[in-house]
Amino acid sequence: MQRTLKSLTVAAGLALAVGGASYATSPAHAGTPKNMMVMAMSISDLITLDPAEVFEFTGGEVIANVYDRVMMFEAENLTTLVGGVAESYEVSKDGKTVTLSIRPGQKFHSGNPVRAEDVAFSLRRVIKLKKTPSFIFTQFGWNKDNVDSLIKPVGGKVSITINADFSPALMLNALSAGVGSVVDEKLVMSHEKDGDLGYGWLKNHSAGSGPFSLKTWKSNELVMLEANPSYRHGGPKMSRVVLRHVPEPSAQRLLIEKGDADIARNLTPDQVNGVAGNADLVVDNNPKAALVYIASNNAHPILSKPKVRQ
């Protein structure tokens, strides 16, 4: 079975693809340059920008804008899987092997072309580094000893073999996760030290092909992203986006009311209601993907029953 995928076209039209929930925006851009967007938000959870390691909310948002992933979801419909770096795929009759065709003409921020070799390198690298989010891939039976033989670039395509009892549909969905981000192998490996696959360098730099590149990251201070005018869907509307570390929601509200920030990301429900009547501000609501953990006391005679958990 061969499937040709629709390409994601939304990201370039937005200033930045952000997570969901409610946030307040200032349409006037009073105190900020017209070609730059400033977000007031907490970035205290940002500890790395290597897509093989990122597993926090802020880092996830940053790499979603810096890297294209093998597969992606429609921004306006998070149930629709679309093509990212891959433009089509073919599934073998036994359902064990998926062959990805890589979209031609894509370029990294460095100017290097996006190749099938980059895709294979990026996926293998996640397994070999074995950072926290690698479990998203290891469930498919991939490990450092077999991944080179199970994920292979072949003539502009990438062959991926599943080594466990999982549907290829689940694997394709997994390729839309942060670990599915495609990194520039040539650039990353030029910074390799002691066999670290460029990990020490990529924690604080970027090597992607997305609508933005990383210009600056100062821990617990700011992240500055710069538009990629050569992005495959066209350059973003904003030349720069700044994520300014403002941990206190009250300070975020003050900045947006003064026009010193364009978006406040972490307002409390009461604060959102408080600014809703301000004619100079807009409160936006967007869907947000989230994990919900439910814990139960299995020592309880009722809760211990399997049918309750089912």
Where are the regions that the model predicts?
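Surface-exposed binding/hinge segments that line
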Residues: 101, 138-191
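N-terminal lobe/hinge region of extracytoplasmic solute-binding protein
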Residues: 40-93, 124, 205-209
